[in-house]
Amino acid sequence: MALKQRINDEMKAALLGGDRFVGDTLRNLRGAILDEEVATNKREQGLSDEEVEKVIAREVKKRHESVRLYRENGREDLAGPEEKEIEILSVYLPEQMTESEIEKLVAAKITELGASSPQSMGQVIGAVKSQAGNSADGALIAKIVKEQLNK
């Protein structure tokens, strides 16, 4: 079953089952997916599962940032619901790579590409992202590539 269809089905089930929080969270996600479809002119054919995963990852990242800001400002009452939304949305993301797995992949790509200076950072990041897909955070990849190229 396509990821977008699974999200729609689970949203309906949550709303019919009386779990309003989950239903509303998935409804907001569905809106973000629709926005992406419109922005990329893919309203007719829809987004691929990989593109939907990117939208979900972006939504999770927004919520992580919100939690951080709420905690910095002492608003635990607002951070809690955001964390629940992160848990709900994370179910639809692929298993995330650990930092050590990313480090191994980066080291392999640096060797494969023969990169030796920070000028090749973009090339290495692109190669790692293309292999890792949505299972690795782009910021973490960039940080690790930068560290390894500056050794």
Positions of predicted regions on the chain:
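Charged, compositionally biased, marginally structured helical/coil segments
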Residues: M1-K151
